Amino acid sequence: MNAKILVIKVGQVETLTFSDGSQYESAIRKKVVPSVKIHSLGAEGNDVGLKKHHGGVDKALFFMSADSFNELNALLXIKIFPYMDTATYGENFVVSGLNEDNVCIGDRYQIGSTILEVSQPRKPCERLSKNTENEETRDIVYQTGLSGWYVRIIETGTIKQKDELKLLARPYPQITIRHLNRLLSTPKNEAELDSALEIEVLAEAFKRSIRSQISKFKQQG
């Protein structure tokens, strides 16, 4: 099955109010659009909250698999969040034909007139739990590795709904998004963590997390 863009979402920072009366500023609830222009730092009309942790060259856009989205819905088992609606996890794109098991770090995809490069998995934060109003959401995403992935922009252009994703390059065919997620949850040994640090295209933010894991190994050893 060819990989395709099923839905595109962009959004601005807004004040969100939750059932417990709490509020915070976030751009997590992105809205569906039919197409979007892509620039060097992301998508036109799109913003992120908590810029210390989101956005930038290595986190320009966030992709999720439709299969993973549906699996998370089943695991959360409280509310159903259709992937064709307003973003639940802050996703910019939901795709078919790709998931954490067949997307690799450094993959380059042509979509419409753009070229994007996979830079790292998404590290789930507490705001996922807050937005779904389910305190287990973050842990479930972390434990299952159904994280989605970030990309950096290689060539700007326009992406439309139903565009196909054409794989142009795969420099690290053994290093899937699932594999990288496992390094942060259940690494086998220090050597495989050291090996990941040698991957040039892996985002520095993710490498910092790997270094933290290495420190834990050294403390245990």
UniProtKB/Swiss-Prot annotation:
Please give one Gene Ontology molecular function term for this protein. Answer: pyridoxal phosphate binding
An example Gene Ontology biological process: toxin catabolic process
What is one term from the GO cellular component aspect held by the record?
A: cytosol
Q: Which residues form the MOSC domain?
A: 30-168
Q: Give the matching PANTHER family.
A: PROTEIN YIIM (PTHR30212:SF2)
This chain belongs to which protein, by name?
Answer: Uncharacterized protein HI_0278
Q: What is the organism of origin for this protein? A: Haemophilus influenzae (strain ATCC 51907 / DSM 11121 / KW20 / Rd)
